[in-house]
From Swiss-Prot:
Family: Belongs to the NAD-dependent DNA ligase family. LigA subfamily.
Entry keyword annotation includes Transcription: no
Reactions mediated catalytically: NAD(+) + (deoxyribonucleotide)n-3'-hydroxyl + 5'-phospho-(deoxyribonucleotide)m = (deoxyribonucleotide)n+m + AMP + beta-nicotinamide D-nucleotide
Protein name from the UniProt record: DNA ligase
UniProt KW keywords: DNA damage, DNA repair, DNA replication, Ligase, Magnesium, Manganese, Metal-binding, NAD, Zinc
Length: 736
């Protein structure tokens, strides 16, 4: 529950700003660096708006790492080289209502000291959902293309954009056949087009340097065709190798934006060449020479005349009423456009006004994005099913009468948990409003028939799969099955997790294969995977299996007889034991029997065992409790013993290099710009150092990035050596 601003204490506001900074940074990373968003645009925007409200109410609490100071996200570890933008690629502030657009216009007038009776024009264009890209032309020739990254540093994608037909390798100074500005939406929706019959002769006469900025995107039809082609190619490859085909293992892009980002950011440009990418321009960056125009309209028209596409819906608006009308007109066409958009961008037209208005921390004062609401539709909730996940969590899933939302037919929605069902008051038979935004799972946002006489949905208190008691965690909203590995749903999901890429990474055992083998009674526990060699003839008799595919599967299984110990521990699916925690545990214990013995002692109340576990950096009471509970359950112990009778995990050791930090304790603080926190920790371990999360008298070295706060001060007070990220990179490079 969000607390009203007037009821917040200063300490509460500071804590909330800290949480928001971390949340927004996480979602920025997922969206910009990993192309894998977890929340809708609307949910993200709500976090940003709350942060802005808090900073306005408590300006003295604005943090160094505030989202209001950042653009995009630092470039993650990538094979693509980094590019520093000469002129930062900024973000845009957002508006969500007509009143906010009106306030933007009024704010521009106040800043420029322009009265209501004096005309001021704006441009308006649709905001395409793509990947920002900057194209640097020198003397009319393309010399470099770079992604936005964090606005200051992006990735070099020059070889990749050479395969995008919309991006010319050389600009041609063509005059326009017709203008872009002013008129209403025309029937064709065409952009300003060059007239080849009026080609200028002679050498390039434009600016010596001109950076065109815009969006790389993928048309909706091309996106669907690409996913279909990737599926067909994977099926053909499986047939050629006589492997069983598993659709679950085929890479499918979630939406056109992710497809565009994933296709452009390829180390091998020949992959990009096979992807149907497009581009259009909406602005510019660094310029050496004269800007070819005095208004936004004039420069955009000149860019189009040079042969670079611009938005077909780009217009000049003389009044606020025209701006709002153009937003409505674009919104009315949204479902029929051949590409996905998420709003309309307004910019002050006169460039001298833009220069006077300048920028705030991460956005220009002279532009704003009016966002569209998430796409919604009405339908009937026909049923509510309960699914049981790998960790026993009971998740309600709504089954819908099929409905088209945002160009996609939706039949299922997540209802999250018992509390969400109670909040919405939904029951089978209700009419509901369904919302879909981006690649996030569709969700019910409103119940249209809450007052109709119908029995409330009763959330089960027993597991629908095994009949074990289902209980709520103290202080939590989730309901979980207590059956553990005796629950068939948990067993199949845990088997899938066990063979996943993060765990044992066994090729040939996809989700459908595991479901099939489980139904046949061949797979009950992880150890059964290593007994599949005894069922070769039975597998071969199944439809779709050939000698080669069976042999490939069995060879992949046999290759994991001596698995990495931390991966094996991760594969068991113990609650709260992820990849990092599994590595941390095995670095301390080295062998699995030692871990089990300590966990069992800790559950029995042995204080020394509890101290041993919690002394491991990153291991808290939740992990200790989860380990104890796992080994306390008799069936889990049987599964563990059975598995270790089939595999022989070697003693876990971390290979280290000779380095000046070997044997020392290193702490990382502040914003790391060239690596993630996990990467930094892994580097420290490889150099023989211990990476700690807190500064103490035992700390030997602090690596401080931008925004370093209390840890830096404490280190300085204790006389601990402090270096920046570049200094750390030198240590890593020197160690080889």
């Amino acid at each position: 529950m969000t607390t009203e601003l007037e009821n917040l204490s200063e300490a509460e506001a500071a804590n909330e700003l800290m949480r928001l900074a971390r949340q927004i940074a996480k979602h920025d990373r997922l969206y910009h660096a990993e192309d894998a968003p977890e929340i809708t645009d609307q949910e993200y925007d709500a976090l940003v708006r709350r942060n802005a409200e808090l900073e306005a109410a408590f300006p003295h609490l604005v943090r160094e790492d505030s989202p209001s100071r950042k653009v995009g996200h630092a470039v993650a570890a990538s094979p693509l080289s980094k590019v520093t933008h000469e002129v930062r690629m900024m973000s845009l502030d957002n508006a969500f209502a007509d009143e906010e657009v009106a306030e933007f216009v009024a704010r521009v007038r106040r800043y420029l000291n322009i009265g209501e009776d004096e005309a001021i024009a704006f441009t308006a264009e649709d905001k395409i959902d793509g990947l920002s890209c900057s194209l640097r032309y020198e003397n009319g020739k393309l010399v470099r293309a770079a992604t936005r990254g964090d606005g200051q540093v992006g990735e070099d994608v020059t070889p990749n954009v050479a395969h995008i037909g919309d991006i010319p390798q050389e600009l041609t100074p063509l005059p326009l056949a017709g203008g872009a500005g002013g008129g209403p939406l025309d029937d064709s929706g065409s952009a300003p087009t060059p007239d080849p019959s009026r080609r200028r002769e002679g050498k390039w006469n434009g600016p010596a340097v001109f950076e065109i900025r815009g969006e790389v995107y993928m048309a909706t039809a091309d996106f669907h065709a690409l996913n279909a082609r990737l599926m067909d190619e994977a099926r053909a490859e499986a047939d050629e190798k006589d492997n069983a085909f598993d659709t679950a293992k085929v890479r499918q892009f979630a939406n056109p934006r992710n497809a565009a980002a994933g296709s452009l950011r390829q180390k091998d440009a020949s992959v990009t060449a096979t992807r149907p990418l497009r581009f259009w321009a909406h602005g510019w960056g660094a310029v050496e020479g004269d800007v070819p125009g005095e208004t936004q309209v004039e420069v955009v028209e000149q860019i189009a005349a040079w042969g670079v596409p611009v938005s077909p819906l780009f217009r000049r608006c003389e009044t606020l009423e025209e701006m709002l009308a153009h937003y409505e007109a674009i919104g009315a066409q949204r479902a029929d456009l051949p590409y996905e958009i998420d709003g309309v961008v307004y910019k002050v037209d006169r460039l001298d006004y833009q220069q006077r208005l300048g920028f705030v921390a991460k956005a220009p004062r002279w532009a704003i994005a009016r966002k569209f609401p998430a796409e919604q539709a009405e339908t009937t909730l026909e049923n509510i099913d309960i699914q049981v996940g790998r960790t026993g969590k009971l998740t309600p899933v709504g089954r819908l009468a099929p409905v088209l939302v945002g160009g996609v037919t939706v039949t299922n929605v997540t209802l999250h948990n018992r509390d969400e069902i109670e909040r919405l008051g939904v029951r089978p038979g209700d009419r509901v409003v369904v919302q879909r935004a981006g690649d996030v799972i569709p969700q019910v946002v409103r119940n249209l028939t809450p007052d109709e006489k119908r029995d409330s949905f009763e959330f089960p208190d027993t597991c629908p799969e095994c009949g074990s008691e289902a209980v709520s965690e103290e202080g939590g909203v989730d309901v979980r099955c207590t059956g553990g590995l005796i629950c068939p749903a948990q067993r199949t999901e845990r088997l899938k997790h066990f063979v996943s890429r993060a765990a044992l990474d066994i090729d040939g055992l996809g989700e459908k294969t595991i479901d099939q083998f489980f139904a046949l009674g061949w797979l009950e526990s992880p150890a059964d995977i290593f007994r599949l060699k005894d069922r070769r003839d039975e597998i071969l008799a199944l439809e779709g299996w050939m000698d080669k595919s069976v042999d490939n599967l069995l060879a992949s299984v046999e290759a994991r007889r001596e698995p990495d110990t931390a991966r094996l521990l991760l594969g068991l699916g113990i609650r709260h034991v992820g990849a990092v925690t599994a590595r941390d545990l095995m670095k301390y214990f080295h062998e699995l029997p030692a871990l089990r013995e300590t966990a069992e002692k800790a559950r029995a109340g042995d204080e020394e065992a509890v101290v041993a576990l919690t002394s491991i950096d990153g291991i808290g009471s939740a992990v200790v409790e989860a380990l104890g509970d796992f080994f306390h359950e008799e069936h889990n112990r049987a599964v563990w013993d059975d598995l270790l009778s089939e595999v022989s995990p070697p003693r876990y050791e971390v290979e280290t290099l000779d380095s000046p930090v070997a044997g020392k304790t290193v702490v990382f603080t502040g914003k790391l710009e060239t690596m993630s926190r996990d990467e930094a920790k892994a580097q420290a371990e490889r150099l023989g150092a211990k990476a700690s999360g807190s500064v103490s008298a035992k700390t030997d070295l602090l690596v401080a990035g931008p925004g370093a706060g209390s840890k830096l001060k404490k280190a300085q007070d204790l006389g601990i050596e402090v270096i920046d990220e570049a200094g750390w990179a030198e240590i890593v490079a020197a160690a080889g």
